Amino acid sequence: MSCGIANAIRWDVSLLIHRSMSSSMSSVQPTSPVSDSPSLGEMHASVAVSRRGHWGFRLLAFLGPGYMVSVGYMDPGNWATGLAGGSRFGYMLLSVILLSNVMAIVLQALAARLGIASDMDLAQACRARYSRGTTLALWVVCELAIIACDLAEVIGTAIALNLLLGVPIIWGVVITAVDVVLVLLLMHRGFRALEAFVIALLLVIFGCFVVQIVLAAPPLQEVLGGFVPRWQVVADPQALYLAIGIVGATVMPHNLYLHSSIVQTRAYPRTPVGRRSALRWAVADSTLALMLALFINASILILAAAVFHAQHHFDVEEIEQAYQLLAPVLGVGVAATLFATALLASGINSTVTATLAGQIVMEGFLRLRLRPWLRRVLTRGLAIVPVIVVVALYGEQGTGRLLLLSQVILSMQLPFAVIPLLRCVADRKVMGALVAPRWLMVVAWLIAGVIVVLNVKLLGDYAVHLMVGVSD
């Protein structure tokens, strides 16, 4: 980013907070119609893109949005489902992680296509396409997904602080409320600073898991066999529950809104040729980033299978339990510390992207702009309350089940983001020359069908479970 562009988009954080707090009513600012305002207006087209030179430099200019999106694919919610799946079923659910990642690559590519082709994010496109009632319903569902995601971040960060520093869970939850300062400072530095911060923490997570996998030394043949799909995943209700949780933890609803917006931060030529070139680079960016997410998610499950399942610890659902077992089983104390460090980095990273997603969703659906600090406080406040209630009623051991439940909730909300996305990218009036080809739409609708069928199956199992419970 050139110095002129960077200076043009910098925020005065102190002035922002002063103006926002001067009047609670003035914090809510109606904007001009969304169709007239670019998504994330202050960061729109703020990152310079070289139009010439070596392809590597052009790729570097586009690298970033995909890695910010990938954060949602390796947040603390993935840890809970991966640990539970690996400890209970060994390597069997690796096939679900692989399938989920392929689904994510396709859906994120479509989200990037929508943003680049239409100059709208998914929330803006939904608002332009649907009635007011439908738009409001989609907004509510998306906000619930963001809160469920934030719930996982709160729990994960609080647990990491407890494991590393001995901070009680309930105080760790309270500490997470002040992360708004971090978000504001990063936004003040510009979009490239946000991306650099996120990528740095991703590298920390990656490094931690490389060391842990080397220490665990899982059998390669069994690991590779786990990537082959098995019918037992669908036939076993417990395996299906965890599989749906993995899908929910991997393919995040709000990531589709986020990606369709932040790809527009690049200052590519808004011409047919410029858009097509930008789409190629954006898809390369997101695919590379999601392959990193695949490695990390698979590593969590492989670690659980190699360390816990192999030692007959079949019910490791709590992250704290995994931390306590890692050092004795592996015989290396640093493994547990690396595990907790990666968890903390994951929770902090997710904070940044969840804040951006919340801002995009509210502005796109409602034409309503909140100050970033207020938006963050509202979302985090709604996520903190259920965690505090669960800790107060059931103790710290209840957070693990709450974490798993949050991922299943996310999966249940996926159709409400995926189906509008598919309808938009198939509309030539919206997409122009970049309308999604028929073969891609067939693949995308198959993915949507899998998501819907899995959720219907889960609801059916829940209904049967409830009826059996009542009859008993």
From Swiss-Prot:
GO terms for biological process: iron ion transmembrane transport. Pfam families: Nramp (PF01566). The keyword Nucleotide-binding does not apply. It is a multi-pass membrane protein. Keywords: Cell inner membrane, Cell membrane, Ion transport, Membrane, Symport, Transmembrane, Transmembrane helix, Transport. InterPro entries: NRAMP_fam. It is found in: Cell inner membrane. GO terms for cellular component: plasma membrane. GO terms for molecular function: cadmium ion transmembrane transporter activity; manganese ion transmembrane transporter activity; metal ion binding; symporter activity. HAMAP family: NRAMP. H(+)-stimulated, divalent metal cation uptake system. This is Divalent metal cation transporter MntH. It comes from Xylella fastidiosa (strain 9a5c).
